[in-house]
């Protein structure tokens, strides 16, 4: 996938994930700050040229365990900055631990979008691909960008219902009574 596609999709998923812990604006800002460098690191550091001069993915960044690490680096830096700033403004800023979780997810979401492409990802040092689409396939890239924008819109329009246990209990209780 293209780097823009990775960024839109990751920002959408991480924003929605972060709304379970804080307000959508904080989640959106932290998702932008984490996603852009994490995807850059994974794509730039994780490609090298083969014997024909074609860029190919490497095991260095496109494996599930190592992607956790590469996504966690920008999150750790942001967490340290927010934690340091938060000391003076305790009641205003939320606890920034969700930023670390967003960082862990960021690398794995990058791999999720690379899975249906020709290059695939590496599992146990062997290449694995679910589909064989070109990385610049406009339909696949558009679908991922649209999904990311949809998730961002859900998170800003009240998609954080999981915070309230009573809403979940009410939904499942009514579903069970109807069946």
List each language-model region with its residue ranges.
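N-terminal membrane-targeting hydrophobic helices
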Residues: 1-179
